[in-house]
Amino acid sequence: MSIRTGKVSSLLQKELSSIFEKELPRSGPLLTIVEVKVTADLGIARVYVSLIGSEKERGLLMEHLQNETKYIRKLLSSRIRHQFRRIPELEFYEDEQYDKARRIEELLKEALNRPGEEQTES
């Protein structure tokens, strides 16, 4: 990642976080912008979001984000249009690291709480 794309990614993440917090508040799953990756030509911004909620709620919110992409891009444009010639297209992806970490935690707890199993040394 070049310095320029890194700065653009950071700015987009900050502005999108602010948009979701202040201009598009929703009840339902908690939404956090984990990372924004911008293509080298700055034409596409891939926005990775972490969602905490039920599977159904998360699915509905991802669908909502896909449907509202143009509106979100318009809000973003109104904030940063003086810094860019062209506002990147937005693509939203669910970041599943939280779910993976939670599943690993559950498996570890389950393994540690199994009664009657003795560990042997090799």
UniProtKB/Swiss-Prot annotation:
One of several proteins that assist in the late maturation steps of the functional core of the 30S ribosomal subunit. Associates with free 30S ribosomal subunits (but not with 30S subunits that are part of 70S ribosomes or polysomes). Required for efficient processing of 16S rRNA. May interact with the 5'-terminal helix region of 16S rRNA. GO terms for molecular function: ribosomal small subunit binding. Its main location: cytoplasm. Gene3D superfamilies: 3.30.300.20. It comes from Prosthecochloris aestuarii (strain DSM 271 / SK 413). Monomer. Binds 30S ribosomal subunits, but not 50S ribosomal subunits or 70S ribosomes. The gene is rbfA. PANTHER family: RIBOSOME-BINDING FACTOR A, CHLOROPLASTIC-RELATED (PTHR33515:SF1). GO terms for cellular component: cytosol. It is found in: Cytoplasm. This is Ribosome-binding factor A. InterPro entries: KH_dom-like_a/b, RbfA, RbfA_dom_sf. The keyword Cytoplasm applies. Belongs to the RbfA family. Keywords: Cytoplasm, Ribosome biogenesis. One of its GO terms (biological process) is maturation of SSU-rRNA. The keyword Cytoplasm applies. It holds the Pfam family RBFA.
